[in-house]
Curated annotation (Swiss-Prot):
Involved in the export of arginine. Important to control the intracellular level of arginine and the correct balance between arginine and lysine. It is found in: Cell inner membrane. The lineage of its organism: Bacteria, Pseudomonadati, Pseudomonadota, Gammaproteobacteria, Enterobacterales. Coiled coil: none annotated. It comes from Escherichia coli O6:H1 (strain CFT073 / ATCC 700928 / UPEC). The keyword Lyase does not apply. This is Arginine exporter protein ArgO.
Length: 211
């Protein structure tokens, strides 16, 4: 059964490693050393829920509901554009240290709300967990399916906690004005690039839906 665990671990790692909204947010919280362990835990728990839903049957709901998929897609586009705009605004600030200090004043609940939006409004999360993991894990018998799910969940926990701790450890180097400007520019570009990709997919999906 361990072979199924390592298959899930490898696939989960491959899907979670690329820079996206969730990873960018965890990294930034680690650099700020602001509730970064709590955010890593909440991200991992969110992934746990999504992975279990996808592997144990939730994928059918998304695939059979084109309007739900469209709603998730365009909600994600709007959020990613807004998130990217915030990153660009911080990067272009004449006093980036002051802008970063203002971010540090955010309360715990606002940070949690942003984390939930970054996770649950990102359509790629549903495609990864419901479509990819759901199609692969759904073909397995009950016991192998559990080990496969455990492997993918382990990848999420290891990655988010590792990323948060590493970012906090490197914070003295990454918190400089130059580093913050570069990080925010990269995050803004990635968020807008993903948003444009999603918008293109959303338009194609809408054309197929109404044709």
């Amino acid at each position: 059964m361990f072979s199924y665990y390592f298959q899930g671990l490898a696939l989960g790692a491959a899907m979670i490693l690329p820079l996206g909204p969730q990873n960018a947010f965890v990294m930034n919280q680690g650099i700020r050393r602001q509730y970064h362990i709590m955010i890593a835990l909440l991200c991992a728990i969110s992934d746990l829920v999504l992975i279990c839903a996808g592997i144990f049957g939730g994928s059918a709901l998304l695939m059979q509901s084109p309007w739900l998929l469209a709603l998730v897609t365009w909600g994600g586009v709007a959020f990613l554009l807004w998130y990217g705009f915030g990153a660009f605004k911080t990067a272009m600030s004449s006093n980036i240290e002051l802008a970063s200090a203002e971010v540090l004043k955010q309360g715990r609940w606002k940070i949690i709300a942003t984390m939930l939006a970054v996770t649950w409004l990102n359509p790629h999360v549903y495609l990864d967990t419901f479509v990819v993991l759901g199609s692969l894990g759904g073909q397995l018998d009950v016991e192998p399916k559990r080990w496969f799910a455990l492997g993918t969940i382990s990848a999420s926990f290891l990655w988010f906690f590792g990323l948060a701790i590493l970012a906090a450890w490197l914070a003295p180097r990454l918190r400089t004005a130059k580093s913050q400007r570069i990080i925010n520019l990269v995050v803004g570009c990635v968020m807008w690039f993903i948003a444009l990709q999603l918008a293109r997919d959303g338009i194609a999906h809408a054309q197929a839906l109404f044709s």
